[in-house]
């Protein structure tokens, strides 16, 4: 078994909506990013790539490459997952923690879990997503952006 950890952060800028966990969430602010700015899927992709020792999302999909301008992070996650499976890994489970003062995530989390399970070809019981605030402390608490952490467990497939 192998464990990977991922982290991502994006600052608010421009107008919304925002995309988190593949879900379009109405909000007055947008997130500044080269791709769609999905902090949850970026952190998750990094966790999965880290567990498989395949580097990180920036190495695989550099923000200097115009091909990834405005990229759908679900597509990036699926491509990373294909590469991980090619190395002989299956999914144990993933756990994602979104850190944001606003907008509230609770009503959107079930759909995030559905999308992640679809993209990884796994059961919903293998995907956990939760959200928390920083009690108005730090940059997320001041409403300057959103952060996310993710952990992934991979299992080497039996030969």
Curated annotation (Swiss-Prot):
A divalent metal cation binds at residues 8, 10, 42. The keyword Nucleus does not apply. Disulfide bonds: none annotated. Keywords: Isoprene biosynthesis, Lyase, Metal-binding. InterPro entries: MECDP_synthase, MECDP_synthase_CS, MECDP_synthase_sf. It is an enzyme of class 4 (lyase). GO terms for molecular function: 2-C-methyl-D-erythritol 2,4-cyclodiphosphate synthase activity; metal ion binding. Pathway: Isoprenoid biosynthesis; isopentenyl diphosphate biosynthesis via DXP pathway; isopentenyl diphosphate from 1-deoxy-D-xylulose 5-phosphate: step 4/6. Gene3D superfamilies: 2-C-methyl-D-erythritol 2,4-cyclodiphosphate synthase. Its cofactor is a divalent metal cation. The record marks 34, 133 as: Transition state stabilizer. Its EC number is 4.6.1.12. It catalyses: 4-CDP-2-C-methyl-D-erythritol 2-phosphate = 2-C-methyl-D-erythritol 2,4-cyclic diphosphate + CMP. Binds 1 divalent metal cation per subunit. It holds the Pfam family YgbB. 4-CDP-2-C-methyl-D-erythritol 2-phosphate binds at residues 8-10, 34-35, 56-58, 61-65, 100-106, 132-135, 139, 142. GO terms for biological process: isopentenyl diphosphate biosynthetic process, methylerythritol 4-phosphate pathway; terpenoid biosynthetic process. HAMAP family: IspF. Homotrimer. Belongs to the IspF family. NCBIfam families: ispF. Involved in the biosynthesis of isopentenyl diphosphate (IPP) and dimethylallyl diphosphate (DMAPP), two major building blocks of isoprenoid compounds. Catalyzes the conversion of 4-diphosphocytidyl-2-C-methyl-D-erythritol 2-phosphate (CDP-ME2P) to 2-C-methyl-D-erythritol 2,4-cyclodiphosphate (ME-CPP) with a corresponding release of cytidine 5-monophosphate (CMP). This is 2-C-methyl-D-erythritol 2,4-cyclodiphosphate synthase. It comes from Enterobacter sp. (strain 638). The gene is ispF.
């Amino acid at each position: 078994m192998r464990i990977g950890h991922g982290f991502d952060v994006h600052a608010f800028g421009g107008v919304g909506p925002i995309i988190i966990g593949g879900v379009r969430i109405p909000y007055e602010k947008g997130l500044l990013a080269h791709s769609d700015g999905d902090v949850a899927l970026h952190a998750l992709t990094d966790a999965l790539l880290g567990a498989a020792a395949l580097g990180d999302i920036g190495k695989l999909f550099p923000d200097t490459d115009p091909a990834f301008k405005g990229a759908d992070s679900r597509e990036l996650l699926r491509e990373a997952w294909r590469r991980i499976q090619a190395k002989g890994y299956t999914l144990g489970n993933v756990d994602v923690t979104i850190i944001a003062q606003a907008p509230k995530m609770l009503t959107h989390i079930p759909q995030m879990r559905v999308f992640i399970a679809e993209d990884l070809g796994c059961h919903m019981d293998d995907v956990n997503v939760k959200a928390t605030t920083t009690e108005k402390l730090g940059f997320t608490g001041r409403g300057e952006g959103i952060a996310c952490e993710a952990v992934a467990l991979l299992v080497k497939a039996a030969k």
